[in-house]
């Protein structure tokens, strides 16, 4: 059957119109998609500021507790009279009030007089510990530190066991021959104890172990992401890493468990841990893609020891979330 010239022209115009419509639709969709990704990434960057604030706030809370206790007359008096056990009950209240995992008193030479959380362990020297060294120089100090299993065992076997992980294979991780991790990351503070003349008598040191401690990451999720879910999955997540290992996280795996013991994507590890640069891109997190932000965590000697992460599920629905407390973000 022959098609008239008029019909051929009409069909040509129709084909051009359809093609143009498809192209325009593709361009519009691409522009919208990139805009949504850009806006989500900006929100994640802002959320990372909030996460850092929350992490630092917990550290400062511990530091205040140690400082105000170190200047109490009852502590100084017991120290001078060498009757440290008399203040044990007061120190145990401090441990409970500030959620401390360890609290230790040392003399002016760095010798442990008493571990209030583990009274059976004392008499060893902590003079090589950088926190103790600074405190005995009459300087207060707080920060992040990584402790080996042998160091953790001095604080208690239960604490050392809580720190230990069997590594769980994770897609896109950097290959490793290691099967376990036994070190622990702690938030820690130490302050000098002075006599009436300002002479250093010793130091008080305390802190919390972050391994399997979900207080900070859950606070980040609750404040910044409102605990919102999509198809049963948390939209906003947070993690504290020791190296590239998730030691505290609310990322959930396919079995419905926290993904502690899994590792970060290889590209993230190389940029953040090896180069010391933040990662502000999409990343594969355990079993899904997220719009993410990672930054290094450094110890008091400026060594990179881990990472702080926040992420928003990439396939979250529009219009999405905005952090609830932008006034906290700096």
Predicted regions and their residues:
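Membrane-interface helix-start motif
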Residues: 3, 313-330
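Extracytoplasmic/periplasmic sensor domains and loops in membrane signaling proteins
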Residues: 80-90, 111, 115-177, 213-227, ...
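Short, hydrophobic beta-strand elements of compact beta-sandwich sensory domains
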Residues: 202-209, 291-318
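Amphipathic alpha-helical bundle/coiled-coil segments
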Residues: 52, 56, 129, 207-210, ...
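Short acidic/glycine-rich beta-turn/loop cap or linker motifs at sensory/regulatory domain boundaries
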Residues: 106-111, 197, 210, 242-247
């Amino acid at each position: 059957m022959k098609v008239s010239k008029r019909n051929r022209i009409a069909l040509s115009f129709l084909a051009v119109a359809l093609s143009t419509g498809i192209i325009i639709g593709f361009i519009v969709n691409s522009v919208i998609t990139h805009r949504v990704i850009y806006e989500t990434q900006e929100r994640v960057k802002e959320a990372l500021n909030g996460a850092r604030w929350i992490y630092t706030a917990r550290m400062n809370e511990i530091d205040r507790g140690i400082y105000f206790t170190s200047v109490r007359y009852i502590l100084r008096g017991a120290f001078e009279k060498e009757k440290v056990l008399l203040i044990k009950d007061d120190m145990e209240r401090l441990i409970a009030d500030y959620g401390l995992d360890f609290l230790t008193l040392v003399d002016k030479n760095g010798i442990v007089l008493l571990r209030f959380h583990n009274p059976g362990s004392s008499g060893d020297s902590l003079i090589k510990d950088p926190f103790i060294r600074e405190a005995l120089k009459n300087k207060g100090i707080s920060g992040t530190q990584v402790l080996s299993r042998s160091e953790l065992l001095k604080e208690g076997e239960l604490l050392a066991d809580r720190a230990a992980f069997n590594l769980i294979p994770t897609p896109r991780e950097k290959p490793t021959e290691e099967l376990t991790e036994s070190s622990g990351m702690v938030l820690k503070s130490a302050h000098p104890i002075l006599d009436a003349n300002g002479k250093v008598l010793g130091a008080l040191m305390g802190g919390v172990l972050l391994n399997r401690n979900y207080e900070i990451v859950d606070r980040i999720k609750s404040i910044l992401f409102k605990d919102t879910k999509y198809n049963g999955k948390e939209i906003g997540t947070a993690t504290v890493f020791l190296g590239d290992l998730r030691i505290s996280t609310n990322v959930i795996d396919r079995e419905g468990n926290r993904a502690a013991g899994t590792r970060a994507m290889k590209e993230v590890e190389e940029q953040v841990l090896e180069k010391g640069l933040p990662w502000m891109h999409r990343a594969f997190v355990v079993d899904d893609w997220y719009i993410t932000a990672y930054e290094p965590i450094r110890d008091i000697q400026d060594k990179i020891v881990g990472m702080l992460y926040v992420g928003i599920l990439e396939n979250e629905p529009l219009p999405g979330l905005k952090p609830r407390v932008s006034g906290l973000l700096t």
